UniProtKB/Swiss-Prot annotation:
It catalyses: (S)-dihydroorotate + NAD(+) = orotate + NADH + H(+). InterPro entries: Aldolase_TIM, DHO_dehydrogenase, DHOD_1B, Dihydroorotate_DH_1, Dihydroorotate_DH_1_2, Dihydroorotate_DH_cat, Dihydroorotate_DH_CS, Dihydroorotate_DH_I. Gene3D superfamilies: Aldolase class I. This is Dihydroorotate dehydrogenase B (NAD(+)), catalytic subunit. Substrate binds at K47, N71, A72, I73, G74, L75, N130, N195, T196. It is found in: Cytoplasm. Heterotetramer of 2 PyrK and 2 PyrD type B subunits. Catalyzes the conversion of dihydroorotate to orotate with NAD(+) as electron acceptor. GO terms for biological process: 'de novo' pyrimidine nucleobase biosynthetic process; 'de novo' UMP biosynthetic process. Its EC number is 1.3.1.14. SUPFAM superfamilies: FMN-linked oxidoreductases.
Length: 312
């Protein structure tokens, strides 16, 4: 039997291909199930889940930018109980689709409460920890900007989680390396990166920010070079697997993420412009890999990681 050249294995996840719709751009999957069979996907990262329901930020919440968009949704979600009882069971009809649950919170206790329970769902195979949230107990500074806080949070959720933890790194920091190292020391199983870059747009007529929240997260093709740089930086100091994301919209973008050091790839904003983008990427990968002399993604991951080790 021929080996699947697109297959990759990372902690908790045996993926038939590396393409994963990113959290916040794919709802809870059901919205896209009208377009294609979700079982085609490597995995899906569902919308952020918090202990209680959140209504999110006031509108306007999104603004277009050249080569991207700003969003300030504010983690709108139905809360842990509804996700466990309604959203996740609906995805059980896809037997070959491992789910990555995205977890957010306002304090360490929030994260611990959700991580302790959500991994018990039979189809949740890993957790993505969104540490870009403001820590309300520490003056609103994001968890992911302080190595010590990031270490403590990772350690706390690892104690209660029954599935591997992938910590989502924020690019809104001076130096990402000490934060990644602190998270690895806290026991993380991998990273997902990058989260959105902080941005703002101003309405020339009102002279005020377009977003009601004033600032929002910048995503889309504009941030891809930043993502590539940061993935490369983290991969050069850590052997933990990385789910790379940030501006992916073509097959070449996917392979560039792998060559920077990723072991799987998240696709976010591109889902809004083309609902079929993920199946298209999956279909297009084998031909492009053949053109570039790439036998398999597992082999590419090995070669890139070995090359980075030798460069140290």
């Amino acid at each position: 039997m021929m080996k699947n050249p697109l297959a990759v294995s990372i902690p908790g996840l045996t993926l038939k291909n590396p393409i994963i719709p990113a959290s916040g751009c794919f709802g809870f999957g059901e919205e896209y199930a009208n377009y294609y069979d979700l079982d085609q996907l490597g995995s899906i990262m569902i919308k952020a889940t918090t202990p209680q329901a959140r209504y999110g930020n006031p509108t306007p919440r999104v603004a277009e930018t050249p080569s991207g968009m700003l969003n300030a949704i504010g983690l709108q979600n139905p809360g842990l109980e509804v996700v466990m009882q309604e959203k996740l069971p609906k995805l059980e009809k896809y037997p070959n689709l491992p789910i990555i649950a995205n977890v957010a919170g306002a304090c360490e206790e929030d994260y611990v409460a959700v991580c302790a329970k959500i991994g018990q769902a039979p189809n949740v195979k890993a957790i993505e920890l969104n540490i870009s949230c403001p820590n309300v107990k520490h003056g609103g500074i994001a968890f992911g900007t302080d190595p010590e806080v990031a270490f403590q949070l990772t350690q706390a959720v690892k104690k209660v989680a029954s599935v591997p933890i992938y910590v989502k790194l924020s690019p809104n920091v001076t130096d990402i390396v000490p934060i990644a190292q602190a998270i690895e020391a806290g026991g993380a199983d991998g990273f997902s990166m990058i989260n959105t870059l902080l941005g703002m747009r101003i309405d020339l007529k009102t002279r005020k920010p377009i977003l009601a929240n004033q600032t929002g997260g910048l995503s889309g093709p504009a941030i891809k070079p930043v993502a590539i740089r940061l993935i490369r930086q983290v991969a050069s100091v850590s052997q933990l697997p990385i789910i790379g994301m940030g501006g992916v919209q073509t097959v070449d973008d996917v392979l560039e993420m792998f060559m920077a050091g990723a072991s799987a790839v998240g696709v976010g904003t591109a889902n809004f412009t083309d609902p079929y983008i993920c199946p298209k990427l999956i279909d297009g990968l084998p031909k492009r890999m053949e053109e570039l002399g790439i036998e398999s993604l597992e082999q590419l991951i090995k070669e890139v990681r070995e090359g980075q080790q030798n460069a140290r």
